[in-house]
Amino acid sequence: MSVYRIKYTPRARQDLRKLPRDVAQKAIRAIDEISDAPYLYIKKMKASNPKHPVYSFRVMRDVRALLSIHNDVLIIHVLEVEHRKHSYRDF
């Protein structure tokens, strides 16, 4: 049973639809697996806002998920899921 609930933003859902089906399924499974203890698997992005940090999670070799974690309500917001060369543009 996972401690954190996972919510996908519309952008993340769109990103998953653009990925090949097998890659998208692996990404969803990997994100579900970290919901018990997400801080063991993620890296805080250096340029993110200290009050609302953004984290990077390596889903596969070349696929990254950008996450925002809200500890007060135990929710992981998945912001983006993209190839790593595209995922850091907006953050």
Identify the role of each PLM range:
Residues 5, 22, 31, 45-46:
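Hydrophobic alpha-helical segments with strong N-terminal bias
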Residues 26, 43-44, 85:
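A general lysine-centric signal
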Residues 2-5, 10, 14, 18, ...:
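Enriched for short, Lys/Arg-rich terminal
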Residues 8, 23-26:
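Generic hydrophobic secondary-structure packing signal
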Residues 32-57:
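A short, surface-exposed loop/turn module that caps and links secondary-structure elements
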Residues 21-24, 39:
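Alpha-helix boundary/capping and short turn/kink residues
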